[in-house]
């Protein structure tokens, strides 16, 4: 019996491998904890500081008494409007551009140059996009400081990532699917519409939805192109979800958080932390929605 046990006992090389494996596991676990625990600590701290003002009235009331009381209805509605409008502009243009670059454009120096420009534009700081929006949309296009100028600026800022995510999602679809469809007599567009896009939709939607959270959290582009310190809107109601005209300035959560934290005297810290909690909750909700979409759509794949 002891001979059998000795025969299958791990040797020094095997013991060393197991030791390295356990050490790697512990290191990865500690690294993950070092990333997650500070985030949870920050989130808990912000929620505790915001707790005195977190209520339904905080969401559905306008700021009052020179921004020292009330809620965040006007900034919340402004953020909703500008994000929806920017997404309505950027999503179709970005997806169509990604489809063209992936499925129609020939592989040459011009295509490589365009792809390189798209990748580089994704890393341009938001303040540069803000200055571009001022020059093009506020001044040249004549929109003025308005929700239209801010939405167009955010759309330009989010376009590169949407294009990139679309091209990568389309490239992930096996080329054999296209060949099989072509052999059955389908045209290029029929192949894209019925085979390629349905199999790439999870990656495309993930890229689009994640840009919603980015647009909702940006401050510089809207600060330069349309966000104001205070704009009164009608309190809660279905009609008040779109109180702004395209040429009207607006309030936004990110800029509202900045102003009450740095420019308003007499405002309690709870108001600023409450605004931060709502903004964080909005971003987390969008990210969770993108994860759910991706998981559910990928589960339908047959490959």
Features from the language model and the residues they span:
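Interhelical loop and adjacent transmembrane-helix boundary motif
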Residues: 63-70, 222-280
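Transmembrane alpha-helix signature in integral membrane proteins
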Residues: 70-100, 208, 287
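Alpha-helical transmembrane segments of multi-pass membrane proteins
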Residues: 73, 77-82, 118-122, 171, ...
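Membrane-cytosol interface at the C-terminal ends of specific transmembrane alpha-helices
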Residues: 89, 95-108, 115, 144-196, ...
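C-terminal transmembrane helix and the adjacent membrane-cytosol boundary/short C-terminal tail
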Residues: 101, 167, 171, 175, ...
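Generic hydrophobic transmembrane alpha-helix motif, especially the helices
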Residues: 119-156
């Amino acid at each position: 019996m002891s001979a059998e046990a000795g025969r299958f006992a791990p040797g020094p090389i095997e013991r060393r491998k197991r030791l390295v494996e356990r050490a790697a596991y512990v290191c990865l676990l500690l690294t993950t904890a070092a990333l997650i625990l500070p985030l949870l600590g920050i989130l808990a701290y912000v929620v505790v500081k915001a707790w005195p003002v977190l209520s339904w009235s905080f969401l559905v009331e306008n700021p009052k008494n020179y921004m020292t009381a009330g809620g965040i209805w006007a900034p919340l509605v402004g953020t909703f409007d500008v994000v929806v409008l920017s997404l309505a502009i950027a999503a179709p243009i970005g997806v169509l551009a990604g489809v063209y670059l992936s499925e129609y454009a020939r592989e040459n120096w011009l295509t490589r140059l365009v792809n390189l420009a798209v990748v580089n534009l994704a890393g341009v700081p938001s303040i540069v996009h803000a200055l571009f929006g001022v020059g093009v949309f506020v001044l040249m296009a004549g929109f003025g400081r308005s929700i239209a100028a801010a939405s167009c600026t955010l759309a330009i800022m989010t376009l590169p990532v949407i294009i990139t995510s679309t091209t990568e999602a389309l490239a992930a679809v096996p080329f054999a699917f296209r060949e099989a469809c072509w052999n059955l007599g389908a045209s290029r567009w029929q192949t894209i519409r019925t085979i390629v896009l349905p199999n790439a939709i999870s990656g495309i939607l993930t890229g689009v939805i994640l840009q919603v959270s980015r647009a909702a959290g940006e401050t510089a582009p809207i600060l330069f192109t349309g966000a104001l310190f205070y704009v009164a809107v009608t309190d809660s109601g279905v009609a008040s979800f779109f109180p702004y005209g395209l040429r009207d300035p607006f309030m936004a959560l990110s800029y509202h958080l900045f102003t009450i934290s740095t420019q308003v005297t007499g405002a309690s810290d709870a108001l600023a932390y409450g605004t931060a909690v709502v903004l964080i909750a909005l971003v987390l909700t969008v990210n969770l929605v993108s994860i759910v979409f991706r998981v559910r759509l990928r589960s339908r794949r047959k490959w």
